[in-house]
Amino acid sequence: KRKQRRIRTTFTSLQLKELERAFQETHYPDIYTREDLALRIDLTEARVQVWFQNRRAKFRKTERVIQPDTTTTPSSSIPINMNNIEHNPSLTNVQLTSPDNSIYNPKLLSSVSLDDQDKLHKAIDAYNTMDKYETNTTNDLLNRMKETDLPHQSSTSPLSYHSKDELKYSKEIIGPFKKTGQMKFSNEFYPPLKDSPFSVMQKSDTLHHSIIPSKSYIDWSNPCRQGDNDSINNNIMNSTTITTTTNNNSNIHPLYKLTQTCRQVNRLLVGGAHDTPLNTFHKKISDK
């Protein structure tokens, strides 16, 4: 059998306008949307479905053409000035943020017709040239600022940042390193620092002696007997005399004084806690 030749459908401008408007809303309309659209533009649902298939294929083709341009566009976080883009009511639903991730985004292109895309491309090209000009001007300004800060300026000028003494000092420091072709890691070029490990150890020893007192002071870490209240009182009296002497002594660290007072308070609390009626009763019996 001979195949029946398919008649090519021709669309009017009104039909194409309605179809494009529906395509901007969604690329994949459901059966109800297609039937409603077919009734409005006097077409069959099958013709509308075929048109959407062809339109999606055309959109993918244009997307592949535009895709390489995204790699060449410089990334910029500066938003696009809306005054540079020609006002168009169909562009109101497009969110323009930056050329690297929004203008060539397929989701945003779905809501823009082909004619509007050409206008967008022209606007983006103009924006890219403006962006390059701005970066060039900022680089020139930075270079000028660096030149003003460099120490090779004449020190006689009123805008000189470094004085003669500072330049002389820097030359004296850098001079030995320029003369030697090879830097040797020895004491000749790297003299021992003020805070060497040995000096740090010595400092730590002196600090240790300044914090920890001599053996003449009472060691409160040794626990006293619970029932020996006389020894506790003697220790308290001795500690009070010791604290008065330590206040006069400037070598005692303040933190050590604080720990001593805390220990005294702890011993007082421990002595008071153990001085229960039962302990006093046993003490009276032992005294008799």
Swiss-Prot record:
Organism lineage string: Eukaryota, Metazoa, Spiralia, Lophotrochozoa, Platyhelminthes
GO MF terms held by the record: DNA-binding transcription factor activity, RNA polymerase II-specific; RNA polymerase II transcription regulatory region sequence-specific DNA binding
Record key words, sorted: DNA-binding, Homeobox, Nucleus
UniProt keyword Nucleotide-binding, yes or no: no
Pfam families, per database record: Homeodomain (PF00046)
DNA-binding region of this protein: 4-63
Family the entry assigns: Belongs to the paired homeobox family.
PROSITE patterns in UniProt: HOMEOBOX_1, HOMEOBOX_2
One cellular component term from this protein's GO annotations in UniProt: nucleus
InterPro entries in the record: HD, Homeobox_CS, Homeodomain-like_sf, Paired_Homeobox_TFs
Protein's UniProt name: Homeobox protein SMOX-3
Main subcellular localisation: nucleus
UniProt cross-references to CDD domains, sorted A to Z: homeodomain
Localisation: Nucleus
Domain of life (superkingdom): Eukaryota
Natural source organism: Schistosoma mansoni (Blood fluke)
